[in-house]
Amino acid sequence: MKKTALLNAQLSHCIATLGHTESLTICDAGLPIPLSVERIDLALTAGVPSFLQTLNVVTNEMYVERVVIAEEIKEKNPEILTALLTQLQKLESHQGNQIQVEFVSHETFKKFTLESKAIVRTGECSPYANVILYSGVPF
């Protein structure tokens, strides 16, 4: 059995096989997931697991160089945005790099998810709690 925090085999495999610049999306319970992209559905019930819990566990396993966030989160969900940006700042310190943050429209965000290796659906039930994480290299 693994001794790191991430126990979900499907998600662990996905992160382990990410190449440089490939992406993984973490989303709320409502984001449409294209049929062409692998779905890793962690949602159990409303709020479980939360977007931020899932982000924390994933970023403990994944080296992140860039993220994409929907612009609408600034107005519709500033609390999650603040917590997300705080987690990214901590991740920068831990990784020793600067993470590029890009805001795009929600429609553009949904198009970008088509390129993700997988989309991780959480139980989060708050608007625009979604992020696309782009894999970097730790050397």
From Swiss-Prot:
Subunit structure: Homodecamer.
Name the record gives this protein: D-ribose pyranase
InterPro entries attached to this UniProt entry: D-ribose_pyranase (IPR023064), RbsD-like_sf (IPR023750), RbsD_FucU (IPR007721)
Family as reported in the entry's similarity comment: Belongs to the RbsD / FucU family. RbsD subfamily.
HAMAP family documented for this protein: D_rib_pyranase (MF_01661)
Top-tier EC class: isomerase
Gene name as annotated: rbsD
Annotated positions binding substrate: D28, H106, Y128, A129, N130
UniProt EC number: 5.4.99.62
Single GO cellular component term: cytosol
Keywords tagged on the record: Carbohydrate metabolism, Cytoplasm, Isomerase
Reaction equation(s) it catalyzes: beta-D-ribopyranose = beta-D-ribofuranose
Catalytic machinery residues: H20
GO biological process terms on file: D-ribose catabolic process
Gene Ontology molecular-function annotations: D-ribose pyranase activity; intramolecular lyase activity; intramolecular transferase activity; monosaccharide binding
Cited Pfam families: RbsD_FucU
Subcellular location: Cytoplasm
Function of the molecule: Catalyzes the interconversion of beta-pyran and beta-furan forms of D-ribose.
Domain of life according to the entry: Bacteria
Pathway: Carbohydrate metabolism; D-ribose degradation; D-ribose 5-phosphate from beta-D-ribopyranose: step 1/2
